[in-house]
């Protein structure tokens, strides 16, 4: 292995000089032995100098320090040894539970599966969340994005999906925390223990592996931690298992790239993003796919800066997804949670040939009623409800009930709401909304539909409200 020395340090980017006949390849891992720091080569600048990103803090690193070339990209533990463990970007355990004792390691950089290896599935993944199952159903082996600005509930929605799917799911899960709050990662770990998905006494009985590169970490960690998690998920998939991959948050992956892009000497692109934004996103997303041996179903939270869905980062992510769940600040302001916008959210699965005519007609019926209500809002604001035709008054009444029926108490939010979470089957979801569209429940007050599970609960709630009023 060749060795070199540090010649320049600019924050997270470090230049290292090697003998000209043994220059490291791009993506090779370098180690600063004295500091226990790993670097990843990004560019070859010529004259034996390479530019690398530090996978850790560069404090205390000085010019002239010796650097060793490992001759290979960053390798992380893969396989069942990772289950129940929390690891960092390099695959080192950070849960204070001893070494990982892996039998196999894999490079975090690899090519996406070839076209003839890919497999598509039309099987639906039931989430138990009414609004998702109705208007933007998830495909098993598909890619899902949860889009939303700050504080509208991306992480809570993701935690509920993990609670509903991962705990019921017979396969394995990988959770990659990319640049999010350490507190949330900590809460998630203990929730998984309570649910029995993580067994700290017998790791081999655990069903989830966790990889964290949190907000306080240098950009190198946040840039590569998603690839570390994906590498672990790929190994399970290639062994023929069905894997769930949760990534919170894809935007922080992009942001980490933006932070180091200028330091790497690249010219900024639109809104200051790196010029390689689409390529970096493609490299990650093309690997998150299902093959003929196994499937990866990924659920990714995507932060939307300033609630602008046309921002280059979320806009680039849209192209890769099968289902997009858009969280709306306006809906959250009404107190309707989950604050999912049924008009903005979409899914490739919303096709009568896949989900059936009944489900399709119900979903489109709900969307058309809500769209009509949206159009009438301006008239109502100026002239009031009295100026509407009888037909429009009925539409508004049904739309308001539908809006409230799209809300649902979550298990993970029980500490805030004091209500037990509800999981609603797809059959109950469809029949409930069909009844609302057909006018079956026109006589019930709209408040009866707020924060309930199935339609039977709404009817029961209406009865109690009537008794109270009497």
Swiss-Prot record:
Pfam families for the chain: ATP-synt_ab (PF00006), ATP-synt_ab_N (PF02874), ATP-synt_VA_C (PF22919)
SMART domains: AAA
Main location as per UniProt: membrane
InterPro entries the record matches: AAA+_ATPase (IPR003593), ATP-synt_VA_C (IPR055190), ATP_synth_F1_bsu (IPR005722), ATPase_a/bsu_AS (IPR020003), ATPase_alpha/beta_chains (IPR050053), ATPase_F1/V1/A1_a/bsu_N (IPR004100), ATPase_F1/V1/A1_a/bsu_N_sf (IPR036121), ATPase_F1/V1/A1_a/bsu_nucl-bd (IPR000194)
EC number, as in UniProt: 7.1.2.2
The keyword Nucleotide-binding belongs to this UniProt entry's keyword annotation: yes
Listed name of the protein: ATP synthase subunit beta
Organism in which the protein naturally occurs: Saccharophagus degradans (strain 2-40 / ATCC 43961 / DSM 17024)
């Amino acid at each position: 292995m060749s060795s070199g020395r540090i010649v320049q340090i600019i924050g997270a980017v470090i230049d290292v000089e090697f003998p000209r006949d043994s220059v490291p390849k791009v993506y090779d891992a370098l180690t600063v032995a004295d500091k226990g720091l790993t670097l990843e080569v990004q560019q070859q600048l010529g004259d034996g100098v390479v530019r690398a990103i530090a996978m850790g803090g560069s404090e205390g690193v000085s010019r002239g320090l010796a650097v060793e070339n490992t001759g290979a990209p960053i390798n992380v533990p893969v396989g069942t040894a990772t289950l129940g463990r929390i690891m960092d970007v390099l695959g080192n355990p950070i849960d204070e539970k001893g070494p990982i004792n892996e039998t196999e390691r894999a490079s975090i950089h690899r090519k996406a599966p070839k076209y003839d290896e890919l497999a598509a599935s039309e099987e639906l993944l039931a989430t138990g969340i009414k609004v998702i199952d109705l208007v933007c159903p998830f495909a098993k082996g598909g890619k899902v994005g949860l889009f939303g600005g700050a504080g509208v509930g991306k992480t809570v929605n993701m935690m509920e999906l993990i609670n509903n799917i991962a705990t019921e799911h017979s396969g394995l899960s990988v959770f990659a925390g990319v640049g999010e709050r350490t507190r949330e990662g900590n809460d998630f770990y203990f929730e998984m223990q309570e649910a029995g998905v993580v067994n700290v006494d017998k790791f081999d009985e655990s069903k989830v592996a966790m990889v964290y590169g949190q907000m306080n970490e240098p950009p190198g960690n946040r840039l590569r931690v998603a690839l570390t998690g994906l590498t672990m998920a790929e190994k399970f998939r290639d062994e023929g298992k069905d894997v769930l991959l949760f990534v919170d948050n894809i935007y922080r992956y992009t942001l980490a790239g933006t932070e180091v892009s200028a330091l790497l000497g690249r010219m900024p692109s639109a809104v200051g993003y790196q010029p390689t934004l689409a390529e970096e996103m493609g490299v990650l997303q093309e690997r998150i796919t299902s093959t003929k041996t196994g499937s990866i179903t990924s659920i990714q939270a995507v932060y939307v800066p300033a609630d602008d869905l046309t921002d280059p980062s979320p806009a680039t992510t849209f192209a890769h997804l099968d289902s997009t769940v858009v969280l709306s600040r306006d809906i959250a302001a009404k107190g309707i949670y989950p604050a999912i916008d049924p008009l903005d959210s979409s899914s490739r699965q919303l096709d009568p040939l896949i989900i059936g005519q009944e489900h399709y007609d119900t979903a489109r019926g709900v969307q058309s009623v809500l769209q009509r209500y949206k159009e009438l809002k301006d008239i109502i604001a100026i002239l009031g409800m009295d100026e509407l035709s009888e037909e429009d008054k009925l539409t508004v009444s049904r739309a308001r009930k539908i809006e409230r029926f799209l809300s649902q108490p979550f298990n993970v939010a029980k500490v805030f709401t004091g209500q037990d979470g509800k999981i609603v089957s797809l059959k109950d979801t469809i029949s409930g909304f069909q009844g609302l569209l057909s006018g079956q429940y026109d006589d019930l007050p709209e408040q009866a539909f707020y924060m309930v599970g199935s339609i039977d609960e709404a009817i029961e709630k209406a009865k109690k409200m009537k008794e109270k009023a009497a």
